[in-house]
Structures are given as C-alpha cells and as structure tokens.
Amino acid sequence: MSKKHKIKPAVAVNNRTADPYITLGAGRVESDAFWRWGDDNLFPNALALMARRSVTHRRIINDKADYISGKGFTCDEAQQPRLAAFLRHVNGDGESLRQVLNKLAFDKALFGNAFLEAVTDAGHTFLSLHHQDASRCRLARDSAHVLLHHDWTAFKAAEARTLPLYPAFEEQSDGTLRAVIHYKDYEPTFEHYGVPPY
C-alpha cells in the first residue's frame, strides 16, 4: 500500500513597506488638483480587487449592503402619493431609493466612503438622487468639491467632472443645481477619506 503525500500550496507575500496595503501604481502620486486616496491614489482599486479575489469577503460586503437597504422604503400611498412615486423612481435611470441606498451601503462597507449626487433646479421643482461610484471620486484640494474621473490611473483634469460638496449646490451646464454628499466615518489622521471598517 503506497501512501500519497498531499502537497498543500502556500502563498507568501513579501511586503516592501510597513503599510499592509499593496500599491498598484506608481509609488507616489502628487497633484495640486485633488487629495490622494492612498500613496498611489489607487487605494479604492486595491480594495475592490481584494473583494473580487475573496468570495467570503465579497459575500460579507454584499450581505451588509443588503441588510442596510432591506426590502426598501414604504409609505402610505393614499396619503403621500408623490413620496411613494419618488421612492419608486429617485432618478432618471428608474432606480428606486432602495437600489441607490444599496449601492451607497456597498461602497461604504467596501471603501469606508460613499458618494451621493443630489440634483435639483433653482425652483426646487424636483429632486433626483444618483449613486456615484466611490472608486471614481476624489476630494478636490479646496476640500469643497469632489472630482469624478473614469480612470484614476490616467487622470486628465479636462476629463474630470467637478461637483460641490453638500450643502453647497452649483449650477451645471444643463441648468441643474448639483451637490455631492460624502458619507464617511471619523477616523483620526484621515481628514479627507474614511477608512474601511475591516
């Protein structure tokens, strides 16, 4: 009878720095336009990659977002028909308030930050709420605006959208007034961004 030896694979990581988070891009990014989110400004990308590589980690993040958003929001439709209609469709994409809240809760659980864009007009005749992907948001150096960019590995100021932080609203080229609400928990020494809760 021969005995088979099972070989168990092992993974070793050589950490080049005292910081346990892996730097994905250049060692350090300097800019006078925005506050870096991590040394290479790609910390959200590293967190998203970590969640994609661990089924358990991702499941916990998804479950947390689902628990927070629950089954959605309800109200007495007979008493408040406009509120009920708003809860069903909070933006032009047809998303419900629950869907937007679920995305915000996911970002907050994964990144420690979430960004909600509020849209209205000068007469406040409507309100539209849009989730903004936290991995695409950075705080401007004036700490009063948020920069939205599609690819922070190749940032070009001309391609970035700039929106004010709530409660300030600024008129945009389409005539709407917009602001971004930045959700984060207080963390000592982290003035601009929140820290993931894990």
Question: What are the residue ranges of the model-derived segments?
Answer:
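Structured, contiguous alpha/beta core segments that scaffold functional sites
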Residues: 2-56, 60-198
